Amino acid sequence: MSCNKEKDILGNWKLANGQGTLNIEKLGETYKCTWSIEEEDHHHEYLGIGIFVNNKLFVSRYSKKVPMAGVGMYKPIGDFRSNSALWASTQNFDTLGSGIAIRQETNEGFEGDYKVRYFIKEYESPIFDLKIIKKKQNDNLYDLTWSIHNKVQLHGVGIIHNKQMFLAYGGIDFQYEVVILSNVNESELNSKGALITNSSINDEIYIR
């Protein structure tokens, strides 16, 4: 992790097309993003929770009306049956959690059925059944669902970057977007985002 790169991404930004602003601040071990977007006759406000990995900020973006959202990363370990997890949620906004996802199959892809458990501070989650499915229209995007006793509790969208999966997730009644923010230089920020209900990646440029 580069402290300079991390510092460069913080602060106030504006969309290059002039239709919105973005503020990024660090809160403990995570990052809070606030968007204000103007679209035709509508004003939209979004929030985001992010983790900084390899000089990039990976964010879960969601409407201000959403009660809970999370951001995560899966990284293959061992014999490809297991993925380690790094995650954060708005329920513990300033703290990173860990986890482990295990499946029976051995392959280098992320698709499959997993048993997964998460840890944060003194809390252990119940064991979830995690299903990861590649989106048909885009080999780089994935749909994720977390179930307990065959009932889906959470859903999410994942994107592959540097052989790791970064994801945005939350309750099944709400929309989430996984966003990758990276500095082009000190005054330009590149954004790539994918909505949970979409199969395309949207590009945006922020400046200051």
Where are these regions (language model features)?
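Central antiparallel beta-sheet cores of small beta-barrel/beta-sandwich binding domains
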Residues: S2-R208
